[in-house]
């Protein structure tokens, strides 16, 4: 995949979610939730501050993150793979 996000943008591949309930029932449609976790595939250079300096991002390629899938999250298909493009501010945590 050849993509370079700009500024404070991050490219994330959503993690797969278990499609069975704890009782073994296969979940489909709206019952099968989409994960809000994923792996960071690419990061931008950083956020440009008012004084013109660039503040580097706190996440790096390979981090597993929990994100808020809100208004600013863009879904794209790149090389047949669905990815999410979001701002670092849409990330809520890094799983360590």
UniProtKB/Swiss-Prot annotation:
Coarse class of the protein's main subcellular location: cytoplasm
Pfam families referenced in this protein's UniProt entry, alphabetically: Cpn10
Superkingdom: Bacteria
Claim: Membrane is one of the keywords in the record: no
KW Acetylation (keyword) present: no
Entries under PROSITE patterns matching the protein: CHAPERONINS_CPN10
InterPro entries: Chaperonin_GroES, Chaperonin_GroES_sf, Chaprnonin_Cpn10_CS, GroES-like_sf
One GO location term (cellular component): cytoplasm
Functional summary from the UniProt entry: Together with the chaperonin GroEL, plays an essential role in assisting protein folding. The GroEL-GroES system forms a nano-cage that allows encapsulation of the non-native substrate proteins and provides a physical environment optimized to promote and accelerate protein folding. GroES binds to the apical surface of the GroEL ring, thereby capping the opening of the GroEL channel.
Family affiliation: Belongs to the GroES chaperonin family.
Subunit structure, as described in the record: Heptamer of 7 subunits arranged in a ring. Interacts with the chaperonin GroEL.
Protein name stated in the entry: Co-chaperonin GroES
Organism, scientific name: Shewanella loihica (strain ATCC BAA-1088 / PV-4)
